[in-house]
């Protein structure tokens, strides 16, 4: 029965739920479990337009700033995204989630505050008055109906499930209670008929009792109303001739009426069952021997039971029953009150005792049990109770489920341009809400506050404001408040410590058991060689993965796509690199890997690679077994000096013999033989010698690989096979067969091409036979002997370093003389690889190490010669102390060459002008010790080859040891050596090694136009060092000498096409205070050529004079604002795109003495004489005093010199000043004479000092910003014409004594 009721209840509740589910079937199932979500976009345009829109579009404001104050009174996060352009306006996106009734309560307002802050406040409808800018949310009607239907569906389903669970639990509890009651039932003793009659309790309603009886009951009830019963009918039990124990009666009442006996009725149905059982007892006799009285009483009792309203005592029929024993009635009344108290232990708070008739029921347990067995059903719950429970539970479930918790959450997303949010902006969020700055690429220093509610105080969140450097592990806000910091202090978990550089990051200081590092991840700051800059806000993560058992170090400071390198078949490495904006994410990934201080520790973490205790660790043949892990090692290594064979079956010396395991039989025509050769120093180790052999009746050819028949005979004069290869180092034009280094312009030591003499190859004028394939073209005699002499130029070695410049003599001068006789043009028509080069290439087939190919290039060079010129060459360099000496000697040489005799001394050495060369004339002056040969003139000569007899211009007599054959003068055409290789893989690897050797010093790979350096090619500063940075040589200008306040510096701009990109030059200027110790400097200034000089920022003290273009590579720089007679030191560095600096180049020079106008000084000396001559008035004295005081020390020296030179007979200048002006004024004037150095004082005593002015062109540039990484040096001259104008500067010079120019 119970199961049937549960099934009916389940069907009752499931039916409406199914109907609702069907009705709501059109609703999106994904939305059934979500709250209502509404998105609103709010633009800040109205307020920016009305107040200060100009901050967004002002051309003068490149990065406008705006203070924001954003406050959210609802729970929800705040997101800032700077994804807009600078011309776009900021806007807010509100994502409101909640139920239908709460969403319209969300309001917002924007306000422009007086301090220029844009306020955006999200608040409740009742939380703030209606202000301009407030906008409520609106809910469409169709969405509301759909929402109500969905909520009703969820409510019915939830209520049904809760009700079924509750009923199931209740039935189980009652079933357990019933079993407990059966075990506790006590059997009733057998009683007599009188005792059985005594158990019949006669119920007399109180309405049948007289007034006095009712009054006594009222008094008793008033005294103990707190313990009276609450039933609807009052009664007075009367015992019929038997003193029944009220205690036993109460126990029976408890078991029958409260617990229900065997019926195990629920608490809800207990009252109905008690009424049913007690009504059956109402038909019993009320008094002994009076059946009519019983019937009368029962009729009246039933009428009272059926009545629907309380019975008034004034309308009842009063029939009293007399009692003879008042004491007995009193006792029964007291007991009745006790029974009522037991039935209602909580008491009755009502005081209406008279108008509400009450009745207490006492039931016989034994009769109740009988009734239960006969008339009561077995089901624990009847139909009426089941219906009541079902309806009540369904109603409660509907009411409770209709109020599903759906909190109101408002998420704010602020979209702004980059750098718009100014430092000091405020964000006020509800406690528990966060500020999401993950998409805020350029965050500002903002102030964050949290509040418990919209009216609560604000608390500053010191940890949440760490936007620029968020803590990796933990943040302690209390530390920040205690130490008055702007943000909370970062803490680390156990086992970690703070990074010494990045205080907000944590590094591990305790490492557990190493589980292997693969993938092995490292991170550090790198250098972006693609963009040509060093990122300051990025950390590069480099992840190395295991290839086939071995890890190789790669470059870790470059930014390129993942590259895969194959060093040998058993060792590969692939690196995947990711650029991370956030260092914390890099650190978190790194924490999962292991830490290694060195490569050896990394390799040792894998444990022994082999067990070498038995069978040589499994290594074959002459391999050595090692247990320690090493780079490029699988545990089997070759002995020192040996290399693994192609099939890795053994080790051999690749420089000797062949490799029989290369898949081509070692290049042998018939047999490839192997022989074991033990090492003399260690007999346990041996080398595998492999060589070619021939079968019977065949012999090995001269090439060591081919085989020839032994019985084969060559006809007379015939050609039997290939002729023997002849070494070409002793052959005419033999350099054509050797390698060539096109950087050093030198011939390599290794012979690349094979030279044979099978053909009769002879050239005109040469008696020796030439190698095959060599074409020789002779040059006519009239074009063979040519003389060249250069213009005299300042010695470049004198202009750099410590320059001992003298304004008296000027620059020393250098002149070059050369005679060249080109006799033959040589061209190589056919090229055959020599045996030595072939063996070297064959030994490298399949090799993957770049170092092996670089060693081959060092031996054989990186190019081979195709065309060259041969002949004779003699050159001489002549140094002069100054330009005047060179000019005088050259004029004398021209007179002698024309037949003129300037002196007797020169007539003795006069020769035929056709054969007299300028070096011979200089040498004759030096040998004779003539006086015209000035001190400091010297000459050095050298020659290549022996001068032919047909050339009369040779100066140096060749020694007998000099060969008579022509020598190599110049290589006119050369080709890369890798073009001679036929194996595609070897050719590719050799080409990569050639490029690496030419541009990356052999320690890096060429990637387009830059070098990717190996891990070993980085300096202590972390910068790559594989690509050599050319050193610019700083020198004084060869055209413009230094003046008293100006110096012109110049250097050659040199930038290789691959590996190095020069982006700037740095010039440091220092003033030396100690002439003996140049390390003591007073001031120091560092200038950038790009940022300070060509931009015009340092004009007029630093200006460009000449910049590179497509024809010229010289850079000239004018340094002004210098002090006369002062030593300055200038240092130059070249800077490339990785931040490297070249080796410095210095120039130390002393500026000349102050320039003086000697003509003006002589005029002033005449004027002073006229003022001092005769009577000198006060006005004349003052005029003389003012004139002399304003001259300055250099001019005053020349005035003194000219005055004493012409007017000393009238009195010396010093004495005349003291006599005419007085000691005090004369002392002030004459004290200026001591301001100059002794060197300048001596120069100012020269009889003749002339003033000349030179013109110096320079570029007057307007200030402009030039990006160094976009600088094109070849187009720099054209680009500067847009912002610079060519102007002329007049520079004064003094010539002491005779003029320098003749």
From Swiss-Prot:
Pfam families: Annexin_2, ASTN1_2_fn3, ASTN_1_2_N. This is Astrotactin-1. Its main location: membrane. The chain crosses the membrane at residues 154-174, 389-409. InterPro entries: Annexin-like (IPR040685), ASTN1_2_Fn3 (IPR045574), ASTN_1_2_N (IPR045575), Astrotactin (IPR026995), EGF-like_dom (IPR000742), FN3_sf (IPR036116), MACPF (IPR020864). The modification Phosphoserine is found at residue 227. Disruption phenotype: Slower than normal migration of granule cells in the developing cerebellum, leading to a decreased cerebellum size in adult mice and impaired skills in tasks that require coordinated movement and balance. Granule cells from mutant mice have a rounded shape and lack the elongated shape seen in wild-type. At 6 days after birth, increased granule cell apoptosis is observed, contrary to the situation in wild-type. Residues 459-507, 608-652, 656-708 form the EGF-like domain. The keyword tRNA-binding does not apply. GO terms for cellular component: clathrin-coated vesicle; endosome; external side of plasma membrane; membrane; perikaryon. Glycans are attached at residues 115, 453, 729, 742, 804, 984. Residues 1030-1145 form the Fibronectin type-III domain. Residues 175-388 are cytoplasmic. It comes from Mus musculus. Interacts with ASTN2; the interaction is not calcium-dependent. It is a multi-pass membrane protein. Residues 1-21 form the signal peptide. It comes from the Eukaryota. The modification Omega-N-methylarginine is found at residue 337. Belongs to the astrotactin family. Neuronal adhesion molecule that is required for normal migration of young postmitotic neuroblasts along glial fibers, especially in the cerebellum. Required for normal rate of migration of granule cells during brain development and for normal cerebellum development. Detected in brain (at protein level). Expressed specifically in the brain. Expressed in the cerebellum, hippocampus, cerebrum and olfactory bulb.
């Amino acid at each position: 029965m119970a199961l049937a009721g549960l099934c009916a209840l389940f069907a009752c509740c499931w039916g409406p739920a199914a109907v609702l589910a069907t009705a709501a079937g059109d609703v999106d199932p994904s939305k059934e479990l979500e709250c209502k979500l509404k998105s609103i976009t709010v633009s800040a345009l109205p307020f920016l337009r009305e107040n200060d829109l100009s901050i967004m579009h002002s051309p003068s404001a490149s990065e406008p700033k705006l203070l924001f104050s954003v406050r959210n009174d609802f729970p929800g996060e705040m997101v800032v995204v700077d994804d807009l352009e600078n011309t776009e306006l900021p806007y807010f996106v509100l994502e409101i989630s909640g139920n239908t009734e709460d969403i319209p309560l969300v309001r917002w307002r924007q306000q422009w505050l007086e301090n220029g802050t844009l306020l955006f406040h999200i608040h409740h409808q009742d939380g703030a008055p209606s202000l301009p800018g407030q906008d409520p949310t609106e809910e469409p009607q169709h969405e509301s109906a759909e929402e109500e239907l969905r909520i009703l569906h969820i409510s019915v389903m939830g209520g049904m499930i809760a009700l079924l669970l509750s009923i199931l639990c209740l039935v189980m509890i009652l079933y357990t209670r019933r079993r407990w009651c059966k075990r506790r039932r006590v059997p009733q003793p057998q009683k007599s008929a009188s005792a059985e009659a005594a158990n019949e309790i006669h119920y007399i309603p109180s309405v049948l009792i007289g007034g006095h009886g009712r009054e006594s009951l009222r008094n008793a009830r008033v005294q103990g109303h707190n313990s009276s019963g609450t039933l609807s009918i009052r009664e007075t039990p009367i015992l019929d001739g038997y003193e029944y124990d009220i205690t036993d009666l109460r126990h029976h009442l408890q078991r029958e009426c409260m617990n229900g006996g065997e019926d195990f009725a629920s608490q809800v149905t207990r009252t109905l069952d008690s009424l049913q059982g007690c009504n059956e007892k109402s038909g019993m006799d009320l008094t002994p021997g009076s059946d009519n009285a019983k019937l009368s009483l029962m009729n009246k009792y039933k009428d009272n039971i059926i009545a629907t309203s309380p019975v008034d005592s004034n309308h009842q029929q009063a029939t009293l029953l007399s009692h003879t024993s008042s004491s007995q009635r009193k006792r029964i009344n007291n007991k009745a009150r006790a029974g009522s108290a037991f039935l209602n232990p909580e008491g009755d708070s009502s005081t209406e005792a008279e108008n509400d008739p009450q009745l207490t029921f006492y039931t016989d347990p034994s009769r109740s049990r009988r009734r239960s067995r006969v008339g009561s059903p077995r089901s624990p719950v009847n139909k009426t109770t089941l219906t009541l429970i079902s309806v009540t539970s369904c109603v409660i479930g509907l009411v409770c489920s209709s109020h599903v918790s759906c909190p109101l959450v408002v998420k704010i997303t602020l979209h702004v341009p980059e750098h718009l949010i100014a430092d000091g902006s405020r964000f006020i969020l509800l406690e528990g809400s966060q500020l999401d700055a993950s998409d805020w690429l350029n965050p500002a220093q903002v102030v964050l506050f949290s509040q418990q509610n919209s009216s609560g105080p604000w608390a500053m969140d010191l940890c949440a404001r760490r936007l620029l450097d968020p803590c990796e592990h933990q943040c302690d806000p209390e530390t920040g408040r205690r130490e008055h910091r702007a943000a909370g202090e970062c803490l680390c978990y156990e086992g970690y410590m703070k990074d010494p550089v990045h205080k907000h990051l944590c590094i591990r200081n305790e490492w557990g058991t190493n589980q292997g590092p693969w993938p092995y991840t490292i991170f550090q700051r790198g250098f972006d060689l693609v963009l040509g800059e060093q990122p300051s806000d990025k950390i590069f993560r480099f992840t190395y993965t295991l290839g086939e058992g071995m890890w190789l170090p790669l470059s870790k400071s470059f930014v390129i796509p993942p590259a895969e390198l194959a060093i040998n078949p058993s060792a590969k490495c692939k690196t995947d690199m990711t650029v991370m904006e956030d260092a914390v994410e890099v650190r978190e990934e790194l924490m999962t890997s292991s830490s290694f201080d060195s490569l050896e520790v990394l390799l040792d973490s894998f444990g022994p690679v082999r067990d070498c205790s038995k069978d040589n660790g499994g290594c074959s043949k002459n391999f050595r077994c090692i247990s320690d892990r090493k780079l490029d090692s699988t545990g089997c290594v070759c002995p020192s000096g040996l290399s693994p064979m192609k099939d890795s079956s053994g080790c051999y010396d690749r420089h000797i013999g062949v490799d029989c395991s290369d898949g081509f039989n070692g290049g042998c025509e018939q047999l490839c033989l192997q022989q074991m050769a033990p090492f003399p120093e260690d007999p346990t180790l041996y080398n595998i010698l492999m060589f070619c052999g021939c079968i019977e009746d065949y012999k090995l050819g001269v090439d060591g690989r081919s085989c020839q028949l032994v019985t084969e005979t060559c006809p007379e004069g015939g050609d039997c096979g290939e002729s023997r290869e002849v070494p070409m180092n002793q052959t005419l034009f033999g350099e054509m067969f050797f390698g060539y280094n096109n950087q050093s312009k030198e011939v390599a030591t290794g012979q690349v091409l094979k030279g044979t003499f099978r053909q009769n190859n002879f050239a005109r004028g040469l008696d020796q036979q030439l190698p095959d394939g060599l074409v020789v073209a002779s040059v006519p005699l009239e074009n063979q002997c040519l003389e060249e002499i250069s213009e005299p130029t300042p010695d470049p070695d004198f202009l750099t370093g410590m320059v001992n410049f003298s304004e008296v003599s000027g620059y020393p001068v250098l002149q070059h003389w050369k005679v060249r006789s080109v006799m033959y043009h040589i061209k190589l028509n056919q090229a055959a690889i020599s045996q030595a080069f072939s063996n070297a290439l064959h030994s490298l087939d399949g090799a993957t190490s770049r170092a092996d190919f670089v060693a081959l290039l060092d031996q054989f060079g990186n190019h081979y010669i195709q065309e060259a010129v041969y002949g004779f060459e003699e050159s001489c360099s002549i140094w002069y102390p100054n330009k005047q000496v060179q000019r005088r000697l050259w004029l004398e040489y021209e007179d002698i060459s024309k037949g003129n005799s300037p002196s007797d001394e020169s007539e003795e050495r006069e020769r035929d002008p056709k054969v007299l060369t300028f070096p011979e004339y200089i040498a004759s002056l030096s040998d004779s010790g003539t006086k015209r040969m000035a001190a400091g003139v010297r000459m050095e000569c050298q020659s290549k080859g022996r001068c032919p007899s047909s050339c009369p211009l040779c100066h140096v007599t060749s020694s007998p040891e000099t060969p008579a054959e022509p020598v190599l003068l110049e290589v006119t055409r050369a080709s890369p050596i890798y073009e001679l290789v036929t194996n595609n893989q070897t050719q590719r690897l050799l080409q990569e090694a050639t490029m690496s050797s030419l541009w990356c010093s052999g320690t890096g790979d060429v990637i387009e136009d830059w070098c990717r350096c190996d891990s070993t090619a980085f300096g202590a500063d972390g910068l790559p060092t594989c690509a050599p940075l050319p050193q610019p040589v700083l020198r004084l200008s060869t055209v413009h000498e230094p003046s008293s306040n100006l110096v012109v510096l110049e250097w050659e701009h040199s930038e290789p096409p691959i590996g190095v990109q020069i982006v700037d030059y740095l010039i440091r200027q220092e003033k030396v205070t100690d002439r003996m110790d140049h390390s003591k400097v007073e001031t120091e200034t560092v200038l950038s050529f790009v940022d300070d000089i060509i931009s015009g920022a340092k004009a007029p003290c630093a200006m460009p004079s000449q910049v590179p273009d497509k024809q010229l590579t010289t850079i000239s720089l004018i340094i002004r604002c210098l002090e006369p007679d002062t030593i300055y030191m200038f240092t130059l560095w070249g800077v490339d795109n990785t931040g490297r600096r070249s080796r410095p180049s210095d120039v130390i020079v002393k500026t000349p003495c102050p320039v003086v106008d000697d003509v003006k000084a002589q005029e002033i000396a005449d004027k002073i004489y006229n003022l001092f001559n005769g009577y000198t008035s006060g006005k004349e004295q003052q005029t003389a005093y003012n004139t002399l005081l304003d001259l300055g020390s250099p001019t005053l020296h020349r005035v003194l010199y000219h005055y004493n030179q012409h007017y000393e007979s009238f009195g010396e200048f010093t004495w005349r000043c003291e006599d005419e002006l007085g000691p005090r004024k004369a002392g002030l004037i004459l004290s200026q004479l001591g301001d100059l150095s002794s060197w300048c004082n001596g120069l100012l005593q020269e009889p003749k000092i002339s003033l000349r002015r030179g013109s110096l062109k320079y570029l007057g540039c307007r200030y402009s910003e030039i990006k160094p990484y976009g600088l094109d040096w070849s187009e720099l001259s054209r680009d500067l014409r847009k912002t610079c104008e060519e102007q002329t500067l007049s520079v004064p010079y003094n010539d002491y004594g005779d003029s320098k120019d003749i």
